[in-house]
């Protein structure tokens, strides 16, 4: 009789323990099913959120998008929870792009990510409160370029990383919306240096059959190439409509139409005047990027400062708003209605003690984290003493 009671307690305890781990039963929703403001902007720093909101939520718009990279060495809970809180306050939908370590402004080659890097990101990003139900995560950047993939591009390696990312993020929460990396649409096949994006995508599917069926969205770098200078009326494989060719290829490979996130695009002011750029942006948003399957367009870049990205910057010399900024701000927008998460905002000046988790390991075997009380430990010892 005593043994039977113990077995009953074990069953009850097991059920209780199964709920002691952090789990998420929610799932992503189809962003095309909701009113949506596709207008966004690419930023580099969380401090730019309020300025971004003034740009993308203007002219009747609401809940526009921001794309921002997060580097492997930048997993600061206080910083990134404040970012999520500020995005919620400013009605911005965040798109986080995973990045390895390097320098945005001066780099020879970004390091190649590992499974451990991906797991680390999954643990960290799952610890944050996100403003929207869909947690948009882009898995790295332009892997068809060698300087973005440890020196030599490798579609098979990227496909494996993308597949693993889909698995490990979804194990932690069904709210993660996994988006493949935007590819360089100007790259040509140069052994050891770069791979044409369409060849790269085919080789990805050859290496991991069905890889595009494991993800939820397709990132596109629909730059007006060659030379960041072509008019948007050209619908070539390298232009502002390259997203369409990428989407069609996935449709042919997988029989699936993926939502499109144009997270980088833009014209260079070294070749195209501000007035012409303004006309190009207006045409592109109204006649090219008005595809019903496009979820967001976040041109590169809000504020670049000095350096190679200055040619794309919407704000120059600190505060000088370019003509393209004013054009995008004046563009009539929709009021987005994303599904939102409700959670208490963090303190104005939080400390590490305000967060439940502040360390993230790269142990591939680590899948769950649980806190077990002293009383629970005693009960476990008693139960095991049969």
PLM-predicted stretches and their roles:
Residues 9-20:
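Bacterial N-terminal signal peptides
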Residues 29-31, 40-44, 50-57, 78, ...:
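Aromatic-rich peripheral "rim/lid" segments of glycoside hydrolase catalytic domains that contact
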């Amino acid at each position: 009789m005593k043994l039977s009671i113990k077995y009953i307690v074990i069953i009850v305890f097991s059920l209780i323990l199964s709920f002691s781990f952090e789990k998420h039963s929610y799932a992503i929703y189809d962003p095309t099913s909701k009113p949506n403001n596709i207008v966004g902007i690419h930023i580099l720093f969380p401090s730019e959120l309020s300025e971004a909101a003034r740009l993308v939520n203007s002219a009747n718009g609401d809940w526009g998008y921001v794309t921002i990279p997060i580097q492997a060495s930048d997993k600061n809970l206080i910083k990134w929870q404040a970012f999520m809180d500020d995005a919620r306050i400013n009605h911005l939908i965040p798109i986080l792009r995973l990045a390895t370590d390097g320098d945005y402004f001066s780099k020879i080659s970004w390091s190649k990510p590992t499974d451990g890097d991906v797991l680390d990101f999954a643990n960290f990003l799952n610890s944050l409160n996100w403003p929207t139900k869909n947690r948009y995560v882009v898995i790295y950047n332009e892997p068809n370029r060698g300087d973005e993939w440890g020196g030599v591009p490798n579609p098979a390696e990227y496909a494996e990383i993308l597949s693993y990312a889909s698995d490990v993020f979804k194990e932690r929460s069904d709210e993660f919306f996994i988006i493949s990396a935007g590819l360089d649409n100007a790259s040509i096949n140069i052994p050891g240096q770069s791979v044409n994006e369409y060849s790269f995508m085919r080789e990805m599917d050859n290496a991991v059959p069905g890889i595009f069926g494991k993800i939820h969205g397709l990132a596109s770098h629909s730059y007006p190439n060659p030379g960041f200078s072509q008019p948007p009326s050209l619908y070539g494989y390298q232009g502002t409509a390259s997203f369409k060719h990428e989407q069609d290829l996935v449709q042919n490979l997988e029989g699936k139409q993926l939502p499109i996130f144009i997270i980088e695009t833009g014209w260079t002011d070294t070749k195209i005047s501000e007035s012409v750029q303004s006309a190009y942006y207006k045409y592109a948003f109204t006649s090219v990027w008005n595809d019903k399957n496009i979820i967001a367009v976040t041109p590169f870049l809000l504020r670049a400062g000095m350096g190679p990205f200055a040619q794309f910057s919407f704000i120059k010399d600190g505060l000088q708003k370019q003509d393209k900024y004013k054009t995008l701000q004046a563009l009539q927008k929709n009021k987005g209605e994303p599904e939102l998460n409700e959670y208490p905002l963090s303190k104005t000046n939080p400390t590490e003690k305000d967060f439940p988790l502040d360390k993230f390991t790269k142990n591939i075997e680590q899948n769950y984290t649980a806190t077990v009380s002293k009383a629970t430990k005693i009960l476990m010892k008693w139960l095991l003493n049969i």
